[in-house]
Structure formats: C-alpha cells, structure tokens
Amino acid sequence: MKDVILRKIKNNLVVSCQAVGEETLNNDIAITLMAKACLEGGAKVLRLSQYSHIKSIKSISGKTPIIGLIKSNYENSEVIITPSIKEVDLLLSLNVDCIAIDATNRKRPSETLEVIFKYCREKSPNTLLMADCATIDDVKNADKLGFDLIGTTLRGYTKETFGKSNMDNDYSFIKECLSSIKTPLIAEGGIWEPYQVKDLLDLGCFAVVVGSAITRPKEITKYFLKALDN
C-alpha cells in the first residue's frame, strides 16, 4: 500500500491547499472548491490541513493521495503542525495517505517526536509519515527515526532559520539535505516559479510542494504588486 502511494507522489508536483485563522478561504466550501480547481488543473497529490477541510475535500478528490496535517496552537509550544497524538488520531480517523508532522527540535506541547512517531507506526503501519524540517539536524534526525518522507517545509519558519530560504545560494540547503540522507526528500517552502520545481526535481528531490503560489490569491496578488514596486 505504501509503495503504491509513494509511486504516485514521486516526481510530481504536490499542491498545498490550506487556509487557517483569519484567511478569507478558511471555510469548508471555499477550500474544497480551491482543491477541486487544482485537481481540474492536473494536480496529482494534495497537501491539506484541518479536520473539516480534509473531510470535505476527500468527498471530491477520489483516489488522489492526500498528505494531511492539522495545525494547532498551544501556549507552551511553538510547534503547530500535527504537534501531538491528539491531532494524529484525528488524521488517522480521516484515513489520509500520509501524515505530516513537525520534526524540528523545538519543545512540543506534550509527547516527544519519538513517541508520536512510534505511536503512528504501531497504530497505522500503512500510513506514510512525512517529517517537516527546518535544519540539517532536523533532517538527519528524521532520517534516523525512519520517516518515509522528509520535507524542507519549515526552513525560515523557526527562530533558528529565520530569514533563510530553500532557494538561497542556488538551493544549497536542499543539496546538503540530498547528500546527507537516503530517505526521499520533498522540497517545500519558498517555491514560486515553475522553473524552480523543475530544478528541484532535476536535483533529485522526490517531489516538490507548492502552496502559496497556486492556492493563496492574497499572497499571489501581493507578489505581483511587489514586483511592480521594484
């Protein structure tokens, strides 16, 4: 089962279709229509967040592989992406193909990353696990733990990596990751141009995730206006 899903993800564009908080598209109908439009455009894999959004989108997505996560805010932790077993259980109940988990070395609200990983493996051994990382140490640790996929998702989103991008210095961080691990690497974060997707696949990335540049109209508009200002 895992191999079938991995084959569907390999060498593909993964479209991240998410909306949280005060974002205009943060309702089930809007985000489902956005996902439907992406599927009509040819998207073969979706990365989705939030229980009700995933449940709604699954009703129209057929056999499209879904990488699922739940963003939750806890007062005692900066970890937001699937931070505890509580979120894991919700995702397992949705039967997503892959669960994305924050795999940074930051303090978690309850269970450690190792405990969550073990829980997932025991509870649902056929569900893929993706480690969302920010640093090379995160990446190496996720590789050691045995994650099925490792993503560069959180590069630039932690205090340690603030101001850094996966696109810096001709993809130097991506290249370092690729040379350091055997686990399939998914490039994610800061990707705004089609040529970058091709570059990253040519470098050896297993797949590439694009979100804002496709599914966040507000950010796309700001991107174009910034170009005009420059």
UniProtKB/Swiss-Prot annotation:
Gene Ontology cellular component list: cytosol
Catalysed reaction, written as an equation: an N-acyl-D-glucosamine 6-phosphate = an N-acyl-D-mannosamine 6-phosphate
CDD domains named in the record: NanE
EC number(s) per entry: 5.1.3.9
Keyword list, A-Z: Carbohydrate metabolism, Isomerase
Pathway assignment: Amino-sugar metabolism; N-acetylneuraminate degradation; D-fructose 6-phosphate from N-acetylneuraminate: step 3/5
Listed GO MF terms: N-acylglucosamine-6-phosphate 2-epimerase activity
An annotated GO BP: N-acetylneuraminate catabolic process
Database matches in Pfam families: NanE
Gene3D superfamilies assigned to the protein according to its UniProt record, in alphabetical order: Aldolase class I (3.20.20.70)
Isomerase in keyword set: yes
Protein family: Belongs to the NanE family.
Protein's job: Converts N-acetylmannosamine-6-phosphate (ManNAc-6-P) to N-acetylglucosamine-6-phosphate (GlcNAc-6-P).
Protein name: Putative N-acetylmannosamine-6-phosphate 2-epimerase
